[in-house]
Design a protein with these regions (language model features):
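Active-site loop-to-helix "anion-binding N-cap" substructures in soluble metabolic enzymes
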Residues: 11-246
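Single conserved hydrophobic/aromatic residue that forms the stacking wall/gate
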Residues: 1-10
């Protein structure tokens, strides 16, 4: 998945800065998956990182719909605790404008809006073609800026890109690719650090990094699975038992 998106965004030079979005309806897939407790956002780093792309788009069009996931809700069910409402409110304050919160792709307004948690939508996780087509059809330009979830074959991070009339990489995504290309240049000693909770979603990335890195360090929940596979005690820590023999 990552290789195909990289080919689309880099080799074909489909960058946001080189894409005509003047007065176009733009869908922006970002990764604003931040910790929220009692409606309060505990970390604003990912929100701040998304601002340059959002501001770049708003300079050329008001027709922007921001799409993100948040947590791991049960697909097809609304969960107020995993609503993007607090995130929308944060951007309203930063941008000093009212932002509408939507729950479907049927009536996208001609002004900035936020789509509700994309993982509430049936078919997102399994890259359902109908959902992918629905997302792709409603926008003139679809911008992928969710680098941290680019490895997922979900409807909003993969299917919609393939089916979009005009898809491109956002500013953050392009910067991450440039940094990776620089890091992976020949004759460099590379230490790769991989975190996260699930080995299953990072396995191919880890395999690729092993061939390109001097050393690979795993942390977070991923490390627990490696430790248990090596026979080390991990107590009640998060682990993927189905990946122990991989």
């Amino acid at each position: 998945v990552f290789r195909r998106q990289r080919q689309m965004c880099i080799r074909d030079r489909n960058h946001l800065e080189k894409t005509d979005i003047k007065d176009k309806k733009v869908g922006l897939r970002v990764d604003l998956n931040v910790p929220i407790e009692n409606g309060e956002i505990l970390s604003h780093e990912r929100l701040s990182a998304a601002l340059p792309t959002i501001l770049h788009i708003l300079k050329q069009t008001d027709k922007l719909c921001v799409i993100t996931h948040l947590g791991r809700p049960r697909e097809g069910e609304f969960d107020i605790n995993q609503s993007v409402l607090p995130i929308k409110k944060w951007f309203e304050k930063r941008l000093n404008m009212n932002i509408e919160l939507l729950n479907n792709f049927e009536n996208i307004p001609d002004n900035i809006c936020f789509m509700e948690n994309i993982r509430f939508f049936k078919g997102e996780k399994d890259n359902d073609k109908n959902l992918s087509q629905q997302i792709a059809n409603v926008f003139d330009v679809y911008v992928m800026d969710a680098f941290a979830t680019a490895h997922r074959t979900a409807a909003s991070t993969f299917g919609a890109i393939e089916l979009s009339k005009n898809a491109c990489a956002g500013l953050l995504f392009s910067d991450e690719i440039k940094n990776l290309e620089s890091a992976l240049e020949e004759n460099k000693q590379i230490l790769s650090v991989v975190g996260g909770s699930k080995v299953s979603t990072k396995l191919e990335v880890i395999k690729n990094l092993i061939t390109k890195s001097s050393s690979v360090v795993v942390g977070g929940g991923i490390a627990n699975t490696f430790l248990k596979a090596a026979g080390k005690p991990i107590g009640n820590s998060l682990v993927e038992d189905n990946m122990l023999d991989t």
